[in-house]
Design a protein with these regions (language model features):
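Structural preference for solvent-exposed beta-strand-turn elements
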Residues: 1-281
């Protein structure tokens, strides 16, 4: 077993931009794919998880350009414009992509099969499948795990209380509700990240949040937009702590970090401990 020795540190100063937020990159691709018009994404996280989502959308007929590694242009096909893929959709190791895709594809008028790598094929998927089935979805898992087989069918809105707080399950139900008949309401037992809700509003969708309840009416169209994916807060966290601990004469500046209140628990804790952190305009 390898051993590591940590010695006294030096300075931690200068400027740094960490990679983009994976959750927002996933949702940017997915929502851009079902929007009408073009969605221009900068700051995209070009990691394998997000690229698995990108390739899956391409397999369903979405034209996607990549002028640069972190710059993606999605030509949306509209809410009902996706096409059946010729082969199973390989989500790699991306659990977020698989669970959100379950909600996205359950109301479509074709059959889909979702698979992944060895790790993803062992993860539970029933928590996302259960509420979707209550909406009328035809979803089959294998002992609760992938492959996930989806026979698209019309859905109806429901009122659903999440038994366990999960942003992924909440988002899957919201995406299904976006395409369902009637109104869908999701109530969560504890706050989770609300990227999906915020981003749907950016695409022109009316979605309301009242305390723990999220409400969306089906049939709304998305309009292509411009998205700047913020730097990932979790990736920035290590450097935030290092900057707080190091005895540096000059500051450490982390550029374009997303400070969604549902993700900044560490920031609040450091401030309570007396850390000298200044927050710029919607960024750390």
């Amino acid at each position: 077993m390898p051993k590591y020795l940590a010695g006294p540190g030096g300075v931690a100063q200068g400027e740094l931009t960490v990679p983009g937020d994976k959750s927002i990159s996933h949702r940017s691709l997915m929502l851009g794919g079902i929007a009408e018009g073009v969605t221009d994404i900068t700051g995209f996280l070009a990691g394998e998880d997000c690229l698995s989502m990108l390739r899956s959308l391409q397999a369903m007929g979405v034209r996607i350009e990549r002028p640069e590694e972190q710059h993606v242009i999605v030509h949306g096909v509209g809410l009902h414009g996706l096409q059946a893929a010729a082969e199973p959709l390989d989500m790699g190791n991306a659990g977020t992509a698989m669970r959100l895709s379950m909600g996205l594809l359950a109301p479509q008028n074709f059959k889909s099969t979702l698979v992944g790598d060895e790790s993803l094929m062992s993860r539970p998927m029933e928590r996302a499948a259960v509420p979707l089935r209550l909406m009328g979805a035809n979803i089959t898992t294998h002992n609760g795990r992938p492959p996930v087989e989806i026979q698209g069918t019309p859905l109806k809105g429901i009122d659903y209380k999440l038994p366990v707080a999960s942003a992924q399950v909440k988002s899957a139900v919201i995406l299904a509700g976006l395409q369902a008949q009637g109104v869908t309401r999701v109530t969560e037992p504890a706050p989770t990240r609300d990227h999906t809700e915020r981003m749907l509003r950016a695409f022109g969708v009316k979605i309301s949040t009242e305390g723990p309840k999220v409400t969306i009416e089906g049939g709304q169209k998305l309009k292509g937009t411009q998205i700047q994916v913020p730097a990932d807060f979790s990736s920035a966290a290590f450097f935030m702590v290092a900057g707080c601990l190091a005895a540096s004469e000059k500051p450490l500046i982390l550029r374009n970090v997303g400070v969604n209140p549902t993700r900044t628990g560490l920031l609040q804790l450091l401030l309570q401990m007396g850390a000298d952190i200044k927050i710029g305009r919607a960024h750390v």
